[in-house]
């Protein structure tokens, strides 16, 4: 019995051995609720006739059949495929969306995506729907999948999508390749090889698109890094100013002769000074001029505390050997820039 023949035990109105049109089966809703046995080369396998109708509908671009099955459908799991329900696939591991992407069936792919079809399922060849659209030059379907946020960072056999696109380049496919590259670049595809080298195209027009996009990415990256450095600098400056105020306040309030190590303010002060020393030390490594003035202005204030820590034992949990405020340590890191 061929795959397109309907078993007599399933639909009694069909004579044995005759073919039943798929369209007529589809209009009956779910004609087969159980999986009949289909013989192939004398080997019986379980075959889902309902899903086969859908697969054939995709190949023949029968949008009405797909839409009928998507309305109140109980077995096309759509977005649930990404959770605990395994997706329905054909023998190649293709879902309906992957099949639509391969064949370039734009309207069917759109109907499936609108119904919530999961985009990142991988077939037995390691392809997602987006990879299939790239490999088969399905530009409109590719744009549609990108619009539905398909993952453009995915790799196929170690290659990113831009490498895969350029690998299939030829003079006959130049226009398709150009449009695919434009779409992928706009979507944020990776523009470097895995070893960090720049991806380049043999075609000058395509290579210029990639080069311009890469330069733009570099500019944006440098801008983000500059903004981050500015935020870090501002944060450090605010911290320095706050600690300076604390030092000046406590220095005025506590005479040098008084044992400040026994005062309630000392633990917090000690923490603030330690933090300050660390900030200035790190900042001088990055930019010696940036915090030079702040470092010099605090040497005198910290010098007194350093001398006190040298002369006296620190009470409580604060131990002399644990501090960074000994004269040899704290003052050396706060010395004028070298």
Curated annotation (Swiss-Prot):
It holds the Pfam family Ank_2. Residues 197-242 form a coiled coil. ANK repeats lie at residues 92-124, 125-157. Residues 7-19, 325-338 have a biased composition (Low complexity). Keywords: ANK repeat, Coiled coil, Repeat. InterPro entries: Ankyrin_rpt, Ankyrin_rpt-contain_sf. The keyword Lyase does not apply. This is Putative ankyrin repeat protein CBU_0781. GO terms for biological process: symbiont-mediated perturbation of host transcription. The lineage of its organism: Bacteria, Pseudomonadati, Pseudomonadota, Gammaproteobacteria, Legionellales. The keyword Repeat applies. Residues 1-31, 319-338 are annotated as: Disordered. Residues 20-31 have a biased composition (Basic residues). It comes from Coxiella burnetii (strain RSA 493 / Nine Mile phase I).
